[in-house]
Amino acid sequence: LNSTSKFALPEVYTFLEMYDAGRIEQLNILQRWMTNDSTKSLQAPIGIDTNGMPIVLDIHEKAHGPHGLIAGSTGSGKSEFIITYILSLAVNYHPNDVSMILIDYKGGGLAGAFQKGDVKLPHIVGTITNIDKAGLQRSLVSIQSELRRRQVKFNQAREKTDEGTIDIYKYQKLYHDGIVKEPIPHLLIICDEFAELKQQQPDFMDELISVARIGRSLGV
């Protein structure tokens, strides 16, 4: 191949192939959890480009940023992308560093991808579906309560260390250094079928946007 040749994207490229692994054990998940530092980067591979090189998404504040929107026509693979991204984050970061709430407006199919019997992905701390309408309001109360809890913990850490301000990155570094004892992970709120949620639950969406705005420095 000469230098101008392009890599031919395969029709099917598995998650393990993206990590150059043949078996799950070869992902070396525990080693990744120990070595990857969520205070410096939150990068996770999500695919390959036309040169065969990894495409990486990094939602760290100093990289791509914490908010994002996936757009595509019906059947274009938006849900598959979300599954890939969630798994990639889980492979690279300990549940003490990254956790997730799933808002699944496809009837629970997304959440089901991360659970087999009684075994589920430890990073997923909550699931909201369009089947459980009453659960929407309960979940919002829980998220707002978590924001207040984080504010209290960050203030306690600030007083303990005499820091001027504490954000999620500083707090996690204090935890990794053993200065504070309770882990507080980044909490990602991931919504599948965002447009459907916005149309059916506009008040919930307004509150969710407010949570995202207020919660940025708190890791939400």
Regions found by a protein language model. Name each.
Residues 1, 16-17, 24-160, 178-220:
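P-loop NTPase catalytic phosphate-binding loop
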Residues 1-11:
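N-terminal accessory nucleic-acid engagement/regulatory domains that precede
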Residues 10, 16-19, 161-162, 166:
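Intrinsic disorder/low-complexity signal
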